[in-house]
Amino acid sequence: MKYDKNQIFVMKAAPNNWVDYADELRNSMEYLWERESWGVKIEYDKIDGYNEKSLISRTWLLLAGFAIENLIKGLIIAQYPSYISNGKLSRELRTHKILNLAMSIEGISLSSEEQNLLKIFEKCIPSWGRYPIPIDIEEISAEVNATTKIKVTFETLFDKFNIQIEEILKQGWKGPHGCTLVSDLKSGLDTQVLNEIIKHKTSRKPD
């Protein structure tokens, strides 16, 4: 069976694929965290003076931010399928302002610690997490070091968004252009239906 471009886009942008990417990022984060003891580096500049930095902190936080961003956008798409219609991602999702995105999600409440972490990710993703500077002087912010407390908050937040997506998929997700998605969490299989059934395995492990 042939699918048009809009249908292909929906299948690739369906909520389960955002979850898969988030899982991959989380796995990479765990790999890094296990090597957290590899050491620190001491930096000095005339602005900030001496700073002690973990060798994995910036990268770990960047991956954490991307993982949460994928889950947030996947959950929003699960709630608002029209955001991936007509072969385009909605302008509402073309942003790294993930706190605002998270606060727009139906049925989600965030603790102050979780909101603060999302604020950190908003600074990390476009700036010090991957570049030495942001695109505008007004966006410069102090770098944050990854800590065990941040890791615990991340894991709680990750699971919170993930559970919400799974609850929607268990009921069956109806996307645009005739695409639907049903998740069989026990078997670890996702089934995409478009006039016929297409089965594929995901990276999620069976319970």
Role assignments for model-derived ranges:
Residues M1-D20, R26, E30, Y80-D207:
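Long, charged low-complexity segments
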Residues I8-D48, R58, L63, N70-S82:
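Short, contiguous, well-structured surface segments enriched in hydrophobic/aromatic residues
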Residues G49-K53:
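Conserved interaction-surface patches within small, structured recognition/assembly domains
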